[in-house]
Amino acid sequence: MEPDLRIALHRAVLADMAGSKPKRLARAMDYQADDMPGAESFASEEDFRDALLFAAPVSGGQLTDMWSKQLRAWDHIQDPAWSTALPCTDERRTDIYSALGLEPSTRKLLDAAAPVIKVPGPVVISKEFVPWYATHQGKSWYWPMYAELLSRKGWSDEAITDLDMATESVVERLSDPTRPEAYQSRGLVVGYVQSGKTANFTGVIARAIDAGYRLVIVLGGTLNLLRDQTQRRLDKELVGRENILRGASEFESDYADDPEWSQGKFVEFGSAPSVLGGFDIHRLTTRYDDYKSLLQGIVALEFEKQEPALPLYDPQNLHRASARLMVVKKNKLVLGKLVKDLKKIRTPLAEIPVLIIDDESDEASVNTSRPKPDTERTAINEKISQLLTMLPRAQYVGYTATPYANVFIDPSDAADIFPKDFIISLDRPKGYMGAADFHDFDLDESDEERTYANSNELAHVRDVIVADDDDTGPLRRAMDMFVLTAAMKLYRAEVDGLGPDAFRHHTMLIHESNWVESHRELLGRVTKLWWQAGYSSAEGHARLRELFDTDLAPVSAVRAEKVSVPTSFDDLQPYIGPAVMNIGADQQPIIVVNGDKDLETGTADFDRRSIWKILIGGQKLSRGYTVEGLTVTYFRRRAANVSALMQMGRWFGFRKNYRDLVRLYIGREEKLSTGKQEIDLYRAFEAVCLDEEAFRDELKQYSVMVDGMPQITPAQVPPLVSQHFPLLKPTTPNKMYNARLVEVQSPGRWEEPTAYPTSPVDLRHNTRLWLPELESLAAEPIQFTYDTKKGLSFPALVGTVSATHMCDLFEALKWSAPSQFEPHMTYLRGVTTRALIDDWVLLAPQHAKPDKRIRLDSTVREYCWFERDRRRGPLFGAISDPKHRVIAHYIAGGTGRSDDPHTNVLCTERRGVVVLYPMVERDHRDVAANSGVLEPGRVVMGFGFVAPEHAHYDGARRVRFATIDSSRDTAIIDS
C-alpha cells in the first residue's frame, strides 16, 4: 500500500494541475513537497515510477487511480491551448507526457495503467464547473467492484470503457461532497430506450458514494413493478450480499427464494466492506418494500460522526461514515413519508451530501400539442422540490430515454428540477438494436432494389392491416412467428453449443391499449387463438413451414451473425414441440401485466425464473420496464398522438444471437381515437425517431468547445427543442425559458424545414413564389450519378438563382410555425449580406418513370410531385431522399469531389444548393393522379438546402441565443 505522504503529494500536484494544464512533474512535486515535511523522498519521477510498477492491479492502487482519472480528463479536453492534437488520440497523450516532462519508461507504465480510450465518449452540454473528482480523497471501493462484475458478466473492455467515461462525466459535474459551501448541481442524462441506463446510474452511484455521497435516493418509476426491478438490480450488482445480510442468516434475506441469490450471482466482497477497508451501504428499502415511515427506527437515517465537532461533510467524518441507499416509488404519499422522516433526524440536513437519481424523469407525456395539467406529476415534483430545499447538498440527476424530456417543454413543470448544470447524451451502445435497425433512414436503393439484406424494414417489420376488429389474421401470423423463433432459439442453443442460459427468456409483446378492460377482451382473444392454433397438428406445421420458407429462412440467411440457420423446415421441426411446451408450461402461455390482480394469469418476474410467454400490457410495459428476450412485438396502439411511441419502443434492446429473428408487427392504418382519420404507426414512429436523431446530432455539434468555452449551456437547450416541436405551449403561460434561439449557422450541412402551412391561402402564396423559379429551370433534366460503382443515378431539372433573390424568396415564405425557420433565416440573411455566397443551384428531382406529374396553375410545363405526409400534427416527416442529399453535399463542397462530371461542373466554392419537392398530401392525390392538374393551394412546396461549406462567420461558433430577461441569471423566468 502506498505511503500516505506519497498519496498526499500526488493529490496536491494533480489538484494544482486539474484546473489548468499538465506541467513539469519534477518541478511540481518539488514545489508541493516544500509544504509537506517528510515528502521530499517521494518527490521524484523515479519514486513515482517505482510506485506505479508495484501498484495493485486495476481494482486497487490510489496512485494509479488518481493519475488514470487525470490523464483521461486531459485526453478528453476539446481544443486546449497546450495541444493541437485531437482528443482521445495517441498524439494527445504524447503532448500530455511532453508537458509533464516524463521519461519513456514512466510513459510506458502510465499507458499500461491508463490506456488511451479511443472512443468518442458521451456528448456533454455543460456549464463550467470546478474540477475536483480526479483528486477526491474518498475510497475507490464500489466502482472498481462494479466494473469487475461487468467484466465477469461478459461486458467487453470497450463497453466498460464507454461506461467509465460516461459515469465519470456525470460525477465530475456534481459538487465536491467535502466542499464547505453547499452547491446543488442538477443534470440530465439522455440514453436510449432499453439501452442500459440502469447500468449507467448504478455506475454513477458507485462512483458518487466512493467520492463521499452518503445518502442516495433513487426515484424508481411510478409503478411497484419498476421500483422492485430497480431495487433488485442495485442490490445484486452494487450493494452486495454482506450489506444485504448485515450478519443475518442467508435464509432471512428478502432474496432467500431468488434463484440467483442461491446461485451466488449477487456481488460478494468476502466480508463487510467496512472490515476490508471500505465502507458499508445500509439499505432503507428492500426487494418488495418501498420506503415506509421509520418511527422508532428513525436512527437508520442518522449518520455517525467520528469527530462530533466537525460537520458530516468534513473528510474526517465523511469517509468513515456508511452510505444509505433507498429506491423509492415516485408517489406523493411515499415521498411525503420520506420528507416527514428527514425533518426528524438529528444530523443537520445541511451537512449531508445527497445524490438523487430520477429514473424515467420525463414520466409524463410531453409530445402533445395541448398538454393537460397532471396533478399527480405536479404533486411529485413538489415533493422533489421539497427534498431539494431541505437538502442543500443534494445533487439531482435525471435519466430519460428521449431528449424531448418534459423538463425542456414546460417551464412551469421544470422550475425546480431543470438540469441547469449539465446534459449528457449517451452514445448508442455497441450491440444495441434501436430505431435505425427497424427503419431505412438513409437507404439509397429504390423500392424495387430493396432486399432482406439491405432493408431493415423488409427484414424486421411486418404490416398489420385489418378489415375490422374480428380480423385475427395478422395476430395469428405474429404468434406463429413467435413459435418459430422459439424453435430457432432451441436449435441454436443445441447446434451452436450456446448452453441453456443463452436464451433464458423468449417473449412476445402485444400492445393495443392501456385500458384494463381492453386487456380482458384481448386476453380472451389471444388465449383462444393459442389453443386453436394446432401447433402439434399437420395443419399447424404446414402453416409454420410456409412462414419459415417465405419469411424466417430468407431473412436469417442474410442477417444471422455467427449463428446457425436450419437449411430447411425439416431441420427445425423437431424443436417446434419443445418450444410450444416451454411457452405453454403451467397451462398459461399468456401473462397480463397491468396491475389488475384478477387478470394476472402469471407473473412476469424475469429475475426469478425463465419466461417463455406472450405478454399483454399497457402502461406497465411502456415505461422503464425491461421485457427480457423480446423477439416478436404486435403493436396497434390507438391514440390521438404519437407521444408514447418513443417510450413504447420496447422492441429496442440487446438481442445477442437472435437479431435476425426480431419482428415488429405494427398497425399501418390505425384509426385515431377521434374522428375517422387514420395513422400509419410505423411512419409516425419513424418521424419521431428521425427528429430525435437530428436533435442528438445537434447536441453533438454544439458540444464542441469554442475558444475554451461551451457553445451552448443547458439553459439554451429548450429553444433547440422548440425547433423540433414549435407548436408546444407550456401549461402555465406566465412562465417561460429565459433564452431564445436567434441564429443557427449550418455551412455544408443539410437543413430540412418541416413546419409548412396548412391553410390553402398560405400554400398558394408559397407555391406562386416558387413557380417562376421552376419555370426558369433547364428544359431537359440532367442525370446525376450518386453511386458510380453501382451506376446509380437520378434525373433532376437544374437552374441557378442569385444569392439575394433566393434570400428574398426565403424571407417571403409562410410557415405554420415561423419560429422553426427564423434562426436559419437569420443565418441565410447573414451570409448573403456579408457576400459569403454568390448563388444557389436549384435542383428539382424528377421521377425515373413518367408518372406523378402535374401542371400547377397556368404553367405550361409539368413537374413531378412527391407523396409526403404530416407525421406530428402539422409537421412533416422526412421530405428529402438520401440520394438527392448526396449530390447537394458535393455541390456545396461538404464532401470533396464527386466522380460524376455533371455534379462537378456545378461545384464552386461559394455556391449553395436548394432541392425542391412539390408535395401532394393524401387528400389530394387522387385529383393529382387523375387530372394531372392541381390548384396551387393544394400543393406544399417543400425544400431542403445546403449552404456553402465555407459560408460562416463569428469564428467557430455555430449557434447564437438571446437572453429574454438579462437581469435574471436563471433558466426559467416569470413573464
Regions found by a protein language model. Give the residues of each.
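Conserved RecA-like P-loop NTPase helicase motor core
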Residues: 590-673, 679-680
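N-terminal accessory nucleic-acid engagement/regulatory domains that precede
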Residues: 5-141
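Conserved C-terminal RecA-like helicase domain
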Residues: 249, 253-305, 340-363, 371-373, ...
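Walker A/P-loop
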Residues: 183-201
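Conserved P-loop NTPase catalytic core
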Residues: 245-267, 352-358, 362, 367-497, ...
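C-terminal accessory/interaction regions of large nucleic acid-associated machines
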Residues: 638-659, 796-975
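C-terminal catalytic or substrate-handling cores of phosphate/nucleotide-
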Residues: 309, 329-330, 464-501, 505-517, ...
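Pre-P-loop entry segment of helicase/translocase ATPase cores
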Residues: 116-181
